[in-house]
From Swiss-Prot:
Keywords: Coiled coil. Residues 309-375 form a coiled coil. This is Uncharacterized protein L754. Belongs to the mimivirus L5 family. It comes from the Viruses.
């Protein structure tokens, strides 16, 4: 066997290491491509006029890229622009951190963008409508004045229905006449939200935990005709209004007292009669003047006490289950690739040991040959 020189040994080791590195990179690219395929391409840009663009307290325009459609369930705001516009350098980490309260596909989404200089795609992070609301309401980095401006700006993308011309006869309505009027806040926001609700108190709390985290402060009264009490309360405290349904937090006790003094406590007879109301499909009520099914659905949501810019609790649970299933499938795939990479690394270590032994043998042969040569000389 011809002995190998030191240079030949080094070349051999370099070739082996490169082959192993190429194999590992190929596997890592497979994982990256698998992840990328699950993320859709970015929707089109919504071009905003100067009047529609958000401005800071000094009247300077804050450029935020908006994509999708002018629908709260299909509109997205570029995170990097929010970071720059509101000087929130830690926002990206806050959103993507596991225990931050932000949930993928509910509060934020990734989209694929074609690379401008190279082939392939890159991912960019966007906030959903709910996610943008959460940033405005929960972030302590946004000054209170800017938060008020941001809420007002965001409200232009919230589809709403005007009820001024629609008169509801409560005696003919199949929707419940009993519900809650509530005042809710959290340590994370600088305002009180005053609204009404016709579901259970438990569902009401669950709904706002999605926005404000696990620690919410809720005060509510059970009353007849909650829509009317909510409207009266809004009119009474109009001077404390910050934006739609949001009021100055320093007057919380006044809101609570007003609700206590003006509620109409339902009697046993009221509760019995309310339960006997025929469960007519609410989607067919008061909608004859509306032209599209979309308008009818939005009105139905309003009659049920569900704002049109909010995803229902059931929908959120359904999305959470889908996300869990996708994460589980993704983890299985990643685990499979991780095991393959570990196997490759293990084989690499074996090969390295093998070639090290070969090199040691060659070194020993060279050493023995050198000794023999010295003896002859």
């Amino acid at each position: 066997m011809i002995p190998m020189t030191i240079v030949q040994k080094m070349i051999l080791m370099e070739i082996v290491q490169k082959m192993i590195l190429i194999t590992i990179i190929q596997k890592m690219n497979q994982i990256a491509n698998y992840t990328m395929k699950k993320i859709i391409n970015a929707p089109g840009i919504i071009k905003l006029t100067k009047k529609e663009k958000i401005k800071d307290n000094d009247g300077n325009i804050i450029e935020i890229e908006v994509r999708g459609t002018r629908d709260p369930e299909n509109i997205f705001f570029r995170v990097s622009d929010v970071i720059n516009g509101f000087d929130m350098p830690k926002l990206y980490d806050t959103i993507t951190r596991n225990n931050s309260g932000y949930r993928q596909n509910i509060h934020y989404r990734y989209f694929n963008f074609k690379k401008t200089t190279k082939k392939g795609y890159c991912m960019k992070l966007f906030l959903t409508f709910i996610g943008m609301e959460k940033v405005i309401n929960c972030s302590r980095s946004i000054h209170i004045q800017n938060a008020m401006i941001a809420r007002k700006w965001l409200s232009q993308f919230s589809a709403s229905i005007k009820f001024n011309s629609l008169v509801l006869d409560s005696s003919k309505s199949s929707t419940s006449n009993i519900g809650y009027v509530y005042c809710i806040t959290s340590e994370k926001i600088d305002a009180n939200k005053i609204g009404y609700w016709k579901g259970t108190r438990k569902d009401l709390i669950c709904r706002y935990k999605t926005y404000y985290g696990d620690y919410v402060e809720l005060f509510c009264v059970k009353t007849m005709y909650p829509e009317l009490l909510e409207k009266k309360c809004h009119q009474h405290f109009i001077n404390y209004k910050l934006s739609h349904e949001l009021y100055d937090k320093s007057n919380t006790d006044k809101y609570k007292l007003y609700l206590k003094e003006n509620k109409i406590t339902p009697t046993e007879q009221d509760i019995y009669e309310d339960q006997q109301i025929t469960k007519t499909d609410v989607k067919t009520l008061f909608t004859t003047h509306l032209t599209t099914q979309d308008q009818k659905n939005k009105l139905s949501s309003k009659l049920m006490g569900i704002p049109t810019n909010i995803i229902s609790v059931d929908k959120i649970k359904e999305l959470e289950n889908e996300i869990k299933e996708l994460k589980y499938q993704n983890e299985i795939k990643e685990l499979k690739y991780q095991n393959e990479i570990k196997e490759l690394k293990y084989q690499n270590e074996i090969n390295e040991l093998k070639y090290k032994n070969i090199i040691l043998e060659k070194d020993l042969e060279i050493s023995n040959l050198n000794k023999k040569l010295k003896k002859k000389n």
